[in-house]
């Protein structure tokens, strides 16, 4: 048995007589291992995909309505609408608006759900508990955060979509140049915007 293994190893080493053949051999080994992993975990992959398909989605046709509502009733500086998938931990910026209008330059960025930023993680837990975390925004937590600061945001609030702790399919972040004078009214307007994004028009 040992001699057979040594014989096979000798044949492989004899075959690898150039850097190209070595690279090809390593590549084949990596692909074979990757294929094995996918095959071995196929039930997990299929299960995750099926669960993702069951998740409700934000009402894409009403995103502009929600943003317009927030600019009109809260005098917002920025409005950012994210699609969230808690199963795989993604939070992707779907739409970004400033007072000048929609800004596509930052759309599509995945800032992740939980990160190495403690303040962000605290807010995410609050969102999952159906709270509306608000506070000063002094330093960026992500690439999108740099955009917030560039647009003049110094104070912000977040709300989950829908405003219901049993589901978490999206997030709205709203920012202002200074803290709103009536924060309770502002939070009510965020709840309305979140409800708008939870269902399509009939």
Regions found by a protein language model. Give the residues of each.
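Intrinsically disordered, low-complexity terminal regulatory regions
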Residues: 2-101, 202
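Juxtadomain coupling helices with adjacent low-complexity linkers
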Residues: 45-51, 60, 64, 170-202
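Short, flexible beta-strand-to-coil junctions
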Residues: 84-86, 162-164, 175-179
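Short, solvent-exposed loop/turn segments that connect beta-strands within catalytic domains
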Residues: 87-92, 102-108, 164-168
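Regulatory sensory and allosteric helical modules in signal-transduction proteins
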Residues: 97-151
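A short, aliphatic-rich beta-strand micro-motif
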Residues: 154-163
């Amino acid at each position: 048995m040992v001699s057979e293994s040594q014989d096979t190893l000798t044949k492989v080493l004899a075959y690898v007589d150039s850097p190209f053949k070595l690279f090809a051999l390593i590549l084949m080994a990596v692909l074979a291992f990757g294929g094995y992993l996918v095959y071995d975990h196929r039930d997990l992959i299929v299960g995750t995909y099926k669960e993702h398909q069951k998740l409700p989605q934000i009402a894409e046709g009403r995103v502009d309505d929600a943003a317009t509502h927030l600019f009109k009733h809260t005098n917002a500086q920025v409005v950012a609408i994210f699609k969230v998938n808690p199963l795989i931990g993604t939070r992707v910026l779907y739409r970004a608006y400033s007072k000048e209008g929609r800004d596509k330059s930052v759309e599509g960025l995945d800032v992740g759900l939980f990160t190495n930023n403690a303040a962000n993680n605290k807010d995410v837990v609050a969102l999952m508990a159906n709270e509306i975390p608000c506070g000063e925004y002094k330093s960026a937590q992500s690439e999108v955060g740099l955009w917030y600061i560039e647009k003049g945001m110094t104070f912000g609030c977040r709300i989950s979509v829908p405003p219901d702790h049993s589901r978490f399919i999206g997030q709205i972040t709203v920012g202002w140049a200074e803290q709103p004078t009536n924060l309770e009214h502002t939070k009510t307007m965020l709840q309305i915007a979140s409800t708008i994004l939870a269902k399509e028009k009939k």
